[in-house]
């Protein structure tokens, strides 16, 4: 697929470059010409920066295959996220971006986001309600991003309430099936025995990869599961419907899928800051703040360093770009000239709510400008 980022930058470069040519032909050089040139450069960079931010908003929605920003209910956003280890690790040790120059060239980057981890919260199973006459946990709906042959890990996380004394807990995960002739409605998925000590409750993970893959291959077989965790006295310790003081302790599925990194080539370019007087093509810093957009459906990062390219590309320096140089030599009036664009970009990792109110952890390619050049 063609790289949208390249076309956006080339278009912006051509559009913005018109500004310096719109001067009055009768204007005369003055002693302030150098100062005016610096002001023009600042205005140019400001226009480029604003256009870059708008382009980023469009690219994120496009790369996540979203027609518009998800309309997530305020109640869901205010609801505490699961307090389990895998999600806390993603948030606490969040790798917003990598400045590793060995990864992520523009040419080798795929366009759409690659999903790495999906956190799926449970819903009530209509089939269970119909059978039992009351809501039961749990039923999981799955994103179309998950393909059965790409699943490398699937863990069901459940929270077990605290115990008052050393206790053996018997955990059983049952899969709901269509009633059989003998009345059987469940089949076992996993059973395990745990020794719990007094104190706070604990999170327990259970491997459900095989079950998930079967559900993905045969969606009609996904009717829900039931979670049981009884102590020696028959007390149910599993939090399935959180009570008072149990916010964020819902069971959930953590699914990890494959993501194959790609090799890239090295390139070099200029780095500048906003006070730089450099006129040549250069990379400038730019921080994108999602909260300023009102994009509260993005959990993390709330902001990231995107950077942008700005500056002049003189033909005298184009020995590195023979094709562009030949075009200009053949038709100097009809050639728009080279444009200062990204020559290397890297991805960002993002934790966000999708349109189905699932929490997705994925990698969005080509969102950070690492190097700029003329092309």
From Swiss-Prot:
Residues 24-266 form a propeptide. Residues 1-23 form the signal peptide. GO terms for molecular function: cytokine activity; growth factor activity. Glycans are attached at residue 71. It comes from Columba livia. Its main location: secreted. It is found in: Secreted. This is Growth/differentiation factor 8.
């Amino acid at each position: 697929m063609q790289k949208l980022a390249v076309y956006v930058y080339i278009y912006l470069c051509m559009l913005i470059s018109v500004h310096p040519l719109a001067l009055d032909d009768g204007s005369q050089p003055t002693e302030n010409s150098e100062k005016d040139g610096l002001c023009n450069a600042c205005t140019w960079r400001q226009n480029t920066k604003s256009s870059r931010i708008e382009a980023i908003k469009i690219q994120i929605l496009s790369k996540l295959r979203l027609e518009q920003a998800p309309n997530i209910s305020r109640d869901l956003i205010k609801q505490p996220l699961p307090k389990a280890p895998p999600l806390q690790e993603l948030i606490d040790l969040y790798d917003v971006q990598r400045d590793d120059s060995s990864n992520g060239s523009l040419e080798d980057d795929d366009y759409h986001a690659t999903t790495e981890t999906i956190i799926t919260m449970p819903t009530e199973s209509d089939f269970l309600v119909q059978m039992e006459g009351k809501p039961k946990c749990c039923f999981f709906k799955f994103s179309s991003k998950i393909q059965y042959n790409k699943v490398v890990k699937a863990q069901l996380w459940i929270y077990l309430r605290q115990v008052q004394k050393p206790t053996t807990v018997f955990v059983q995960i049952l899969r709901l099936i269509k009633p059989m002739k003998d009345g059987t409605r469940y089949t076992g998925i996993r059973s395990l025995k745990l020794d719990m000590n007094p104190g706070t409750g604990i999170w327990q993970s259970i491997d459900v990869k095989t079950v998930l893959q079967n559900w993905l291959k045969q969606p009609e077989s996904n009717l829900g599961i039931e979670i049981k965790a009884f102590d020696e006295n028959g007390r149910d310790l599993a939090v399935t419907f959180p009570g008072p003081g149990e916010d964020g302790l819902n069971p959930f599925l953590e699914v990890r899928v494959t993501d194959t990194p790609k090799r890239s080539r090295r390139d070099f370019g200029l780095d500048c800051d906003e006070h730089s007087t450099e006129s040549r093509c250069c990379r400038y810093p730019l921080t994108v703040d999602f909260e300023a957009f009102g994009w509260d459906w993005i959990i993390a990062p709330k902001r990231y360093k995107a950077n942008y390219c700005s500056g002049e590309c003189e033909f005298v320096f184009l020995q590195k770009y023979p094709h562009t140089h030949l075009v200009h030599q053949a038709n100097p009036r009809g050639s728009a000239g080279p444009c200062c664009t990204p020559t290397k970009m890297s991805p960002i990792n993002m934790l966000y709510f999708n349109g189905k109110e699932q929490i997705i952890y994925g990698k969005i390619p080509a969102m950070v400008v690492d190097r700029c050049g003329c092309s």
